[in-house]
Regions:
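Conserved alpha/beta core of the MobA/IspD/sugar-nucleotide pyrophosphorylase nucleotidyltransferase superfamily
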Residues: 1-64
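N-terminal Rossmann NAD(P)H-binding glycine-rich loop of SDR-like oxidoreductase domains
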Residues: 78, 86
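Catalytic loop of short-chain dehydrogenase/reductase
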Residues: 179-204, 209-218, 230
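Conserved NAD(P)H cofactor-binding loop of Rossmann-fold oxidoreductase domains
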Residues: 134-140
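C-terminal helical subdomain
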Residues: 218, 225, 241-280
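A short, exposed helix-loop element centered on a Lys and neighboring polar residues
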Residues: 166-167, 210
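Substrate-binding pocket helix/loop in short-chain dehydrogenase/reductase
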Residues: 142-143, 150-152
Length: 280
C-alpha cells in the first residue's frame, strides 16, 4: 500500500485488521521499544550507565527480623563504612565478625587469610549469612611513574581480594541463602587521570558483581555493589585532607543504606548513594 503511512503498530492494525481489539496498557518512563539492531546497542549502553533504584529503607523491626541471630562478616570493618555497618548490624542482633589488617592482622588479598576467616567464623557461629567487603586502598599518581610493587599491592587489595572473598564464602552463603556486598566508586564509569589503578579496579568490581549475580542465581546467593558519593572516611581524609563536611556523605548514612541493600532481595545491582542536598 504505497499510499499508507504509519508511525506505530496500532495504526497498521487499525488499517488492515479492524476487527482486532487494541488494548492500552500503562507504560513506564524507563520502557524502551526495540525495533532495530541499533536499539539493542543503545539499550545495553543505558543499562551500563544506569544505577538501580535504592531499596526501600527498612524499619527497626525489619532490621531486627532479618539480622537477629544471623552472622555478618565484614572485611575492612575496623573503621569507616565497614565499621559503621558492623556497628549497625550488631545493634540489631546480628553476630558480627570484623577483620582487617590493623585489628586482626587479616590480609584480605591473601586467599589463605580469607579461607581462615571463613572457617573461624563457621566454627564460632555455625553459619554465615552476609559478607561485606569494604577493604580498599587509594593509590594516586601517574601510571608511568608507579612502581611494580605498588601496582601489585593496589590491584591485589582492590580487585583480587573481592574475588578471593567470593570464592571462599560462596559455599557458606549458598547454604544460608545469603548475600554479599561489594563497593565501587563513581570513577568506575570513566577513568581519571592519576587514579588509573583505582578506577580500573572499581570498574572491574562492577563487572564482577554482575557476573557473579548470574553465576549464583540458581544457588540463591545474592550479590550487589554500592557506589557511594564522596564519603567522609579516614581513607579519604588521608588522601585529600580535611574537606568541608557539607560536601561529603557521612559514613553512617552510607552504612545504613548499604545495610538496606545487603538485606534486600536485589542481586546484580549497582546502587548509587548520593547526598540529597547540599553543596556540590
Amino acid at each position: 500500500d504505497p499510499n499508507f503511512t504509519a508511525t506505530d503498530d496500532c495504526t497498521v492494525v487499525l488499517r488492515y485488521l479492524p476487527e482486532v481489539s487494541i488494548a492500552v496498557v500503562s507504560g513506564h518512563e524507563r520502557n524502551m521499544k526495540v525495533t532495530e539492531p541499533i536499539d539493542v546497542y543503545i539499550a545495553d549502553k543505558l543499562f551500563q550507565l544506569t544505577s538501580a533504584d535504592r531499596p526501600t529503607p527498612l524499619t527497626n523491626e525489619q532490621y531486627s527480623a532479618r539480622l537477629d541471630g544471623r552472622t555478618v562478616v565484614v572485611f575492612g570493618g575496623s573503621y569507616g563504612i565497614g565499621g559503621d555497618i558492623a556497628e549497625l548490624a550488631r545493634a540489631y542482633g546480628a553476630n558480627v565478625r570484623t577483620f582487617s589488617r590493623s585489628t586482626t592482622g587479616t590480609y584480605v588479598e591473601k586467599r589463605a587469610d580469607v579461607a581462615k576467616v571463613a572457617q573461624q567464623v563457621l566454627d564460632e557461629t555455625g553459619r554465615i549469612d552476609f559478607v561485606v567487603n569494604t577493604a580498599g586502598v587509594l593509590v594516586r599518581g601517574e601510571l608511568a611513574e608507579t612502581s611494580e610493587e605498588t601496582i601489585y599491592s593496589s590491584t591485589d587489595v582492590n580487585y583480587l581480594a573481592p574475588i578471593f572473598v567470593a570464592q571462599e564464602f560462596f559455599p557458606h552463603l549458598a547454604k544460608s541463602g545469603g548475600s554479599m556486598l561489594l563497593f565501587t566508586s563513581s570513577s568506575y564509569t570513566r577513568g581519571r587521570s592519576g587514579y588509573s589503578l583505582y578506577s580500573s579496579a572499581k570498574a572491574a568490581i562492577v563487572n564482577l558483581t554482575q557476573a557473579l549475580a548470574d553465576e549464583w542465581a540458581t544457588s540463591g546467593v545474592r550479590v550487589n555493589c554500592v557506589n557511594p558519593e564522596r564519603t567522609g572516611t579516614p581513607m579519604r581524609t588521608k588522601a585529600f585532607g580535611e574537606e568541608p563536611p557539607g560536601t561529603l556523605l557521612s559514613s553512617e548514612d552510607v552504612a545504613r543504606q548499604s545495610l538496606d541493600v545487603l538485606l534486600s532481595h536485589l542481586t546484580g545491582h549497582i546502587i548509587d548513594i548520593r547526598r540529597e542536598e547540599g553543596p556540590a
